[in-house]
Each structure stands twice: as structure tokens, then as C-alpha cells.
Amino acid sequence: IDANLLIAAWSAQSALFERALAILEDPDRTLIVSDALWLEVMPKAIYHAHAEECAFYQAVFARGEYITWSSEIVASAKHLAQSHGLAAMDAIHLAVALAAGASEFISGEKPGKPMFRVKEISARSLWGIVP
């Protein structure tokens, strides 16, 4: 998962709220989380003392399978980024998912983004998932 999915689930105002929450609450789904994901969502919530938001994200991290960065993940991210024209954080998220053996990567990004060109893993957009 990426930060956009978590933010959509937390915000409750996004058009993607129900879809994002359904993904996070699916008991048959293993969520893959990482330091990259933490860095995208936690610092601002902590800095601004948004306790409920922090608790929400922490619950997701506690439920997820935590994958730490490694030189192999960084090398994979570099390869993905240059092969598919990915932004740095998108490449890291996808490399983490691949390292974890995930069957798919779900993002809150719109379907036209470069991450959806990646062939190494099925990347899906919340925008195309029916709740």
C-alpha cells in the first residue's frame, strides 16, 4: 500500500474513503508496510499532535508485515525507477512490495501514473476498485 491509500482511509472525506478502508480492513489481505510509508504519514501527524490520526496509522502498521529497507530493496527501486520512469518513493514502495512477495500493490494514485506501467507486480489504483 502507499501513503495515498492510508490518507484516503483516514480522511473520511475523500471519494476513495470506503475503498481504502475496505482494503485496510480485509482480513484476508496481508498489508506490507515500511519505513518509507511511515515517513510519508507519521511525521506530520506526530508533529501536529494529531493523536487520533497517529493511532489510526499505528494500528495499520501493527497489523502489517513490516519490511525494512535493505541495499537489495534500494537496488530494486533504482532499477524500477529507471526502467519505468517512476518517482523515487513510488519505486521504493514497489520494491518493498516485491521484496515481500506481495501479489499486488494498491495505490491511491490515479491510473495514469508511471507506477501502473510496472510489469514486475500487479499495481492497482483505488480509483478503479469498486467498494
Regions found by a protein language model. Give the residues of each.
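Alpha-helix capping/helix-boundary segments
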Residues: 5-6, 37, 73, 93, ...
